[in-house]
Amino acid sequence: MRIFKSHPLLRLVNSYVIDSPTPSNLSYLWNFGSLLALCLIIQIVTGVTLAMHYTPSVAEAFNSVEHIMRDVNNGWLIRYLHANTASAFFFLVYLHVGRGIYYGSYKAPRTLTWIIGSIILIVMMATAFLGYVLPYGQMSLWGATVITNLMSAIPWIGQDIVEFLWGGFSVNNATLNRFFALHFVLPFVLAALVIMHLISYHETVGSGNPLGISSNYDRLPFAPYYIFKDLITIFLFFFVLSLFVFFMPNALGDSENYVMANPMQTPPAIVPEWYLLPFYAILRSIPNKLLGVIAMFSAILIILVMPITDLSKYRGLQFRPLSKVAFYVFVANFLILMQLGAKHVESPFIEFGQISTVLYFSHFLVIMPLVSFIENTLVELITKKS
């Protein structure tokens, strides 16, 4: 249609969604972008709706959530959609990042896209933490207390920062108000970052492909081919999300959060949501509080160094067997850290956590550069012989 190429706004839609030249050999691993966009839309719509009925007050927050569940038309559906889509969002983001690591999406000329994506992940984690505090159940209160208290590890000014975050000497009304305000605003910041992510992705060389080579020789328009391909995974996503929302809405939550927050009673174990467990395990595996906090934040930020530490001359791990083994060991280790984050701080979980933490950082700082150097050397030796 001619209007799609002449109208200033529709021309943008056309260049990004309709005529965008896309490699012809993309697998379903390239479908996460559309699913993540869908998750963000669901979160913003359900979040704004929930905010209309929520009261950010220590006395009323828990009751207002119960009011949403019992009295608001389809309030239970909106809340469970919001909670379970948050888990789906993180699950898909981890797959998206894993795909990026496997296929070398962090290498030039896509480094800026990778950096913006990493910032999106950090903002997502901050937003999720703020949101987890809002129902003001036991886990909300004590999770907020533990995580904000991490700032007290900063020498000299740490305690002042904690009290500044709380707006008092403990988690109180001021804390809940500011957490609610930030949790409401950050998804829109996230949407802006996603647009930046898309612009940087389209303005460089566009999508990569499973072979890790230039795809300029064989491209297809995004519509209708990849729109239909995206729709397949979107329908599958709705099916799986519906199973959780309608049949097991609390499977990924914590039963302690159905108990009203009580500052006088500590829950048996303070555990964050499953998607933050690997980083919580790294925090707890280091006895020194300050070093633990530094390690936890470094574990998130370390993906930013990948464009520097990957010395390979080749994009992706498809044709690099040693790097493939290292990648699968890293994935297994990440899943082990996720399990350890939910365990009590006792032997042997402490020791396993320390081993897994060392292995996690070693992958980025030692194993990746070493393995890529060995592979480069082997390829050079073979090409010289031939």
Swiss-Prot record:
Which cofactor does this sequence's record say it needs?
Answer: heme b
Please give an example of a GO cellular component term from this record: mitochondrial inner membrane
Disulfide pairings: none
The note on the cofactor says: Binds 2 heme b groups non-covalently.
- Where is this protein chiefly located? mitochondrion
Q: Which residues bind a ubiquinone?
A: 202
Q: Which domain of life is it from?
A: Eukaryota
Which amino acids does the record list as binding heme b b562?
82, 183
- Give the subcellular location: Mitochondrion inner membrane
Transmembrane segments annotated in the record for this chain: 32-52, 76-98, 113-133, 179-199, 226-246, 290-310, 322-342, 349-369
Q: Which GO terms describe its biological process?
A: mitochondrial electron transport, ubiquinol to cytochrome c
The terms under GO molecular function for this entry are:
metal ion binding; ubiquinol-cytochrome-c reductase activity
Q: How does it sit in the membrane?
A: Multi-pass membrane protein
What keywords are annotated for this sequence in UniProt? Electron transport, Heme, Iron, Membrane, Metal-binding, Mitochondrion, Mitochondrion inner membrane, Respiratory chain, Transmembrane, Transmembrane helix, Transport, Ubiquinone
User: At which positions is heme b b566 bound?
Assistant: 96, 197
What role does it play?
A: Component of the ubiquinol-cytochrome c reductase complex (complex III or cytochrome b-c1 complex) that is part of the mitochondrial respiratory chain. The b-c1 complex mediates electron transfer from ubiquinol to cytochrome c. Contributes to the generation of a proton gradient across the mitochondrial membrane that is then used for ATP synthesis.
**Recorded family membership:** Belongs to the cytochrome b family.
- What does the record's miscellaneous section state? Heme 1 (or BL or b562) is low-potential and absorbs at about 562 nm, and heme 2 (or BH or b566) is high-potential and absorbs at about 566 nm.
Quaternary assembly: Fungal cytochrome b-c1 complex contains 10 subunits; 3 respiratory subunits, 2 core proteins and 5 low-molecular weight proteins. Cytochrome b-c1 complex is a homodimer.
Q: What is this protein called?
A: Cytochrome b
Q: What lineage does UniProt assign to this protein's organism?
A: Eukaryota, Fungi, Dikarya, Ascomycota, Pezizomycotina
- Identify the gene encoding this protein: cob
